[in-house]
Amino acid sequence: CHVKLSPPPGSKAECVIINAVECEPYLTADHRLMLEHPEEILVGLQLIMKAVDVKKGYIGIENNKPDAIALMTEKAKDYEGIEIVPLKVKYPQGGEKQLIDAVIGRQVPAPPAIPINVGAVVQNVGTAYAIYQAVMKNKPLIDRIITVTGKSLQQPSNLLARLGTPFQQLIDECG
């Protein structure tokens, strides 16, 4: 996160893109976070935009999450310079380079090029939420929402888990 928020000399960010594309089947943590904490994510995006001195922010969400798109679009009306971008569901849409191309139509050249070389700073939904928590609530990053899923679980869930929680404890929580 720190590296992305500190562009190299001579580089200038033009926009921030929040990656709300869950690139693996069955992952739903970002989706739940958007439904339960949309304003915190939007404020987190504003804070990132301020940190890199840009006026434009995007949140890319796959179009198989119409409830999140509708809610985030409605809430974003109160936040200047922020646009919600519905995206086609295709793998690997959540890859940083693919996301930049889909949202702002710019292609990141081959390495050693990085997103800032095309004016983009990319963070994910969880990071925007964590930045909100850190700045607005003075809460350090000690936990995060994660998806625990699989055919052998009785109750697949999104759990708020402390960093370092053993996998077995999370599995036991879901049966």
Language-model features and meaning:
Residues 1-102:
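Iron-sulfur-cluster electron-transfer modules
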Residues 49, 171-172:
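Residue-level preference for well-ordered alpha-helical positions
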Residues 42, 167-168:
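A generic alpha-helix preference that emphasizes hydrophobic side chains
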Residues 55-167, 173-175:
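Hydrophobic alpha-helical positions that pack around
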